[in-house]
Amino acid sequence: PAAAGAEPQRLVDINEYVVRGNTVLDNRAIEAAVYPFLGPQRSLGDIEGARDALQAAYQEKGYQSVYVELPEQQVSGGVVYLQVTETTVGRVRVVGAKHYSPVELREEVPALEEGKVPDFAQVQRELAQVNRTPGRQVLPMVREGQRPGTMDVDLQVEDKNPWHASIGLNNDYSADTRHLRSVVSLGYDNLWQLGHAISLTYFTAPQDQDNAKVWSGSYTAPLSQRWSVQLSGYQSDSDVATVGSMNVVGQGHSYGVAAIYSLPVTGLWSHSFSFGVDFKDFEEQTRIGGNNDRVPIKYAPLTLSYNGFRYTERSQLALGLSLVAGTGSLLGYGDDDEEFDRKRYRAKSGFGVLKGDLNHTLTFGGDWQVATKAAFQLASGPLISNEQFAAGGATSVRGYLAAENTADDGYLLSQEWRTPSLGRFLGKRAGGYVNDWRFYVFAEGAQLRLQDALPEQDDDFSLASVGIGTRAQLADWLSGSLDWAFPLLEGTNTDKHDSRLHFSVQASF
């Protein structure tokens, strides 16, 4: 009886949807959206479904400023009209830029073209590329335009001075050298207002610079939105003791060039590939007792690398994979197999190395963190010392000396369990100077293998340690860490259960 009083729903035959006002979607995309809602005996719900499907098609393509309406009409001849309203970009301004050119920033977001319907998915991809530059963040602010049917966009810029410098001190030393190490770096990230970056670093042992003295630098020049080229190199002059009375005096350099291709950002991932060549020339002198033996080597390996990054609110992941190939004298530069064999028994100039690394930090509820670090190297055969995998030290296996063991193949695994940051509790009480301060426990180890070892050589090395530590970031410029590590295995230069303290402090400006 109640249903009997209800007005029956009107059904119509729909043969065609006519879309008015569209300039951005092609006919195929429109047909795919509305096709399921064609046919006989269709209701108002079907017509509204066609409108919603078309609206979703615009959204999927990134056209967030497009709205699909169903105007009042009498359906006749099986034709239904849908009206599309497209809001175009009116005026675009760059606001707040202090150290970067507003003109250059504007040109880096071409998807916001005045007078055009913006593809906001493309806008986000372009902004993600813009925001890869250190010390610069650009956010779009959209508001109603001054002209009807338009929107105005402000690109809000927060940028820092592209000049940056740092000075650090630590005790990550190698065998038979003085204990302190210092590093000073200087860089500029926006040369010529084109985003070119240059950096220079000096690393030394301040108590005796003959122990370690290394100059390094790099220059990166963007060529387009995706391509860039990087020049890099270092000059080394050091006296590092290795085993017993044998000292290796290292003087040499490496200069390289690489092309870098940054892939479009996909979801939370950003990826890049690089391909380059390094020209290496090392002149080492080995002293055993009163005898000197000069073992110079020159070679030019090719390197193909992949780097991937994934950042979320609670997870940060970085991946790296590289394939290094020795070229012999293919490029007209470098020593032959005889010279490589003289430096290392059975080493070849045409060597191959596959190496990789992973860093992952996961934040749980209550701000607890777990951090994982892993690295590996696989070699095609015996390698000269410059290309070997090293383990031990403050950034590798704590509790051991820096590069305590080196070998052709190896892997490393480190795990840290971190407390919540005390910065959120002490920040205001300490005048806002404590940004982050955590304590942690860690366990880490490495396994290394020497290929074709000589009869008197060990061919297998294992390192493992556990410990506790703390790391802090004070204000925006001072950071430091202190680790107490307990070696679980005997090392070449470290006794089992002989604990060691590692410290590091760095000031950044």
Model-derived features with residue positions:
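Transmembrane beta-barrel architecture of outer-membrane proteins
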Residues: A53, R125, T150, R181, ...
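Transmembrane beta-barrel domains of outer membrane proteins
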Residues: Q156-E158, G187-D189, S218-P222, S232, ...
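Solvent-exposed loop/turn segments connecting transmembrane beta-strands
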Residues: D172-R181, F203-K213, N405-D408, L489-D498
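Transmembrane beta-strand segments of outer-membrane beta-barrel domains in Gram-negative
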Residues: S228-S385
